[in-house]
Amino acid sequence: MSLPKTANGMDKLKLCYLLLFYLGSSSLTEVSGAQTCEIDSVLCTSDLSEPDDPPIFHDLTTKEIKSVQTYLYHQRDLRLLRPGLAKINTSFIQGMELYLPNKKDVIHYLQSKVPTPKPPRAAVVTIFRGDCDPAVVEEYIVFPLPWPTQHRLHRKVPYYLRPFNDVEFATISDFLTKQVDGVLRQFLEESFGGRLINCGNRCLNFQFASPVGPSVSNEPGARKSWYWLHQLVEYSALHPVDFAVLMKIVGCVYTIEKVYFNNMYFNSLQEVALHYRNPSFPRLRIPYPVDSKQLFSKMERRGILFPEKPVSPPRQVEPEGKRYSVKYQEVKYMNWKFNFRLSPGLGPRLHNIRYHDRLIVYELALQDIVVFYSGAEPPHQYANFFDSSYMIGMNLQGMVPGVDCPTGATFIDSHILTESSLKPAKLINAFCVFEQNTGDFLRRHISKTSPDGPFYEGVPSIVLVLRAITTIANYDYTIDFIFHHNGVLQTKVVPTGYILPSLYTKQNENKYGFRLNNKLIGNLHHHLFNFKVDIDINGQHNRYETLDIVLDKTSHPVSKKPYDVWYQNKIKHNLRKTEMEALFKYDFDKPMHHIFYNNNLKSPEGNNMAYRLVNRGMSKSLLPECSGNEGTGAWMRHQIAVTKRKETELTSSSVYSAFGTKNPVVNFRNFYADNENIVDEDLVAWVTMGTYHIPHTEDLPVTHTPGLDLSFFLSPFNYFPEDPAMGSRDSVRIEAVDKNNLKRGIKIDKQTFPEKMTCKAPIGNYFEYILKRPNVIFDIQ
């Protein structure tokens, strides 16, 4: 959310106060006789306004979005309709985002030591051309910004591969509701206790859809989905009714091809109605649930309350103000500096990540989130979700201080364009930034006696976190980018939210999941996450090498047994020369380190000044290659893949992935199939993490987070002469005044004194704020 520009002479402390008020972070009032902590006006430097002249990595501003709209609506050949008039068979703008210049131009601009013109800004705009014959999705590059005068076609995509959108959802929902209610109203009411139309407080609804693309149906150009029926109570995903319809969409023509009910398939709604009139037809009765606080699917406080009294939980405080700054989507923290932005389709991305002003990563970006379910009935059997097609970035909004992020975090809005609004939409609290004491230590050691001691030295593990949370239907995903003081960059993902269970039957008992209550099976599913890591270690000419740890068979000189041998481990340097050699599938019998470096730069000791990539979230996909939808997500085959960077291979996935084909819009296999040289080239590491989730009763109502976090790390490896965090003012050293005579006492070396703080932590006013503005957290139409 934007703030007014600072007037000349305005006290910076007041600006900090205004920032915190707008963010719902704190209230500078007296509480129980003690004042809340003062904010250091020197440290609090965040500016969350939109720039008039955006930096190169900054998202499109609202001014730029509006100017692109105005320009395109004047292009008569596009025949664009405004939101509200658009239908799936018309031409309308689906969305737009920043289109980055060529990397070489960006690097030249960033590294130039003389004034250099900034590469012109541009937008990539997605237009649904339902008005064409055949219908098509067209992407255009519109430039230069902020006042565009030109556009060029970027690519065309078959219309049946278009991502899900509000215009289509509304049309499909209306069609399904009327068709099914018109033929099966009595059947639905007697079987599931509710209706689709005029339902009062006993409503049924088609809430979820399992895409069935050409690679599944083996029908070229087909766009189909299984739509599941649920009882519409909180939360509807936990109230399936074992009824689904397979719908085929060709242009604006909708056809119901199959109906599934009670382990039976039918060719039409009329066939179901005909069989239902037969007294011998197998009945299924699922009573409509009574909505109450005790309902198992409801996220309301219940059970044995704890703690015994309502005592507030602990929280962190910044006693002397924030130690980071945010301005124009650039964050500065200790020795770190980076830019961040949001892709409406693919989610959060970081750029120009520097440590001690040395470029480490040019781009770190989420590529896709995939969930593959298993089940006995078609909605789960074919539930292969590519979340990019549901627009990962558009679903960032409404993080709650004190729960989703610390109360004192800096909350940042994003502006995007959707097909349902002429004005740019504000995603309130799309990001948060905060510094956090993890409760661990970065390093520590105590030596209690001589000759080394006595001494103690330790540094708390303090990190900066940039967080985004996306909610795709039933699941919530926390995406953290974590910056450690010693030059380590961590990327973490944590899934939570509601599972998608199926109705319990004898056919699916124990095969696809455990029985959770008297009517549900918690279906097995596989979460997978792919990230792009464009690594630039001392420039763009890098090498990828694995340090293979192998067995060393050597002599055993102290053994009395003749010819005895001794086994230990040794390092084998393995330079990966081609892309096919750089495809990594974890093998427990072959431990290794993955390092990236510039061969032209060595440390004083002669070592390669490298960064190590550590994947601690690995998960193996068991699906045969190119089976079903597997080929659309070929990146899931490898836990790490390293390729030569190309401007034509910018993402491993796309928003066109849901309806899988044998030839997807982005085919990741093509990235390495040409097997190019990767020695001394600009390299990209594609990192895949994942976890198999077998739901259990404790996943009701919502999956908890402990044990589900997945992380990968970029860590300096002979890059610095010593620990770069040795200069941390957060360190504490305790030693004897005279190590030979402890009775003379000890001395303590520390430079921060939070124990002197006598004020209380700021009290957030967020909940008062949203009482008046519920759209901050919810979509209010």
UniProtKB/Swiss-Prot annotation:
Residues binding Cu cation are H525, H527, H693
The active site of this protein is located at D387 (proton acceptor), Y475 (schiff-base intermediate with substrate)
> What cofactors are annotated for this protein?
Cu cation; Ca(2+); L-topaquinone; Mn(2+)
Enumerate the InterPro entries for this protein: Cu_Am_Ox_Cu-bd, Cu_Am_ox_TPQ-bd, Cu_amine_oxidase, Cu_amine_oxidase_C, Cu_amine_oxidase_C_sf, Cu_amine_oxidase_N-reg, Cu_amine_oxidase_N2
CC annotations in GO: extracellular region; plasma membrane
Instruction: State where Mn(2+) binds.
Output: D534, D536, D682
Q: How is the cofactor bound?
A: Binds 1 copper ion per subunit.
Give the Enzyme Commission number. 1.4.3.-
Q: Which GO molecular function annotations are given, in alphabetical order?
A: copper ion binding; primary methylamine oxidase activity; quinone binding
What residues bind Ca(2+) 2, as annotated? E579, F671, D674, E676
The region annotated as signal peptide is: 1-34
Q: Which UniProt keywords apply?
A: Calcium, Copper, Disulfide bond, Manganese, Metal-binding, Oxidoreductase, Secreted, Signal, TPQ
Give the matching Pfam families. Cu_amine_oxid, Cu_amine_oxidN2
List localization entries: Secreted
Expressing tissues: Prismatic layer of shell (at protein level). Expressed primarily in the mantle with highest level in the mantle edge and lower level in the mantle pallium.
Q: Which residues bind Ca(2+) 1?
A: D534, D536, D682, L683
Q: How is it modified after translation?
A: Topaquinone (TPQ) is generated by copper-dependent autoxidation of a specific tyrosyl residue.
The similarity comment for this entry is: Belongs to the copper/topaquinone oxidase family.
User: Assembly and interactions?
Assistant: Homodimer.
Record-given protein name = Putative amine oxidase [copper-containing]
